[in-house]
Amino acid sequence: INWKATAKRGQLLVNLHEATLALKVAVVLDLEGLGVQQADLLNEEAVRIACTLCVRLLEAGIKVSAYSNGLDVHSGQPMALPEVSGPGSVLALRKAFACALAANGLEPIEGFFPSGEGQRDENSLLCVLVTRDQRESRARAFAQRAGQREWLQIIPYRDEYEEMPQFGTVRRLYWEV
């Protein structure tokens, strides 16, 4: 109950908090691999998926953070966009994704998975990993970091993919290019 507003209006006013406002989404983009036509195509699609997802989440009022092992063309550092919110952040987000370069020998993406530690409700963090990498070791590492949280892995592919076994509570979405 908002007592100050109730007193001003003379009628009971209750603040409602939408569940989506408490949700935070971390989008992690893996840009390892360059030079092979299929890898380049899949990395480009991965950027498109990650950026579009972030924009839609921001427009829905959800707080977003985005990280990638892809190097920023200006700083030479891995792309990092700590928590942003609101439609006013869309331009900065699009610029960050546009400046992330795919390359060989990048830092392993596992180092960019959020831990969720230090948050009041660690279950309020949803992590979405966008990667063309279909190795089981990567999927296992992501599931291990997720713990009991339901996280999502999006795998862009071309022509065919090999269905991986389910690991933990991570859901996997195969995205045909």
Report residues per predicted region.
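Exposed, interaction-prone extracellular/peripheral surfaces
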Residues: I1-V177
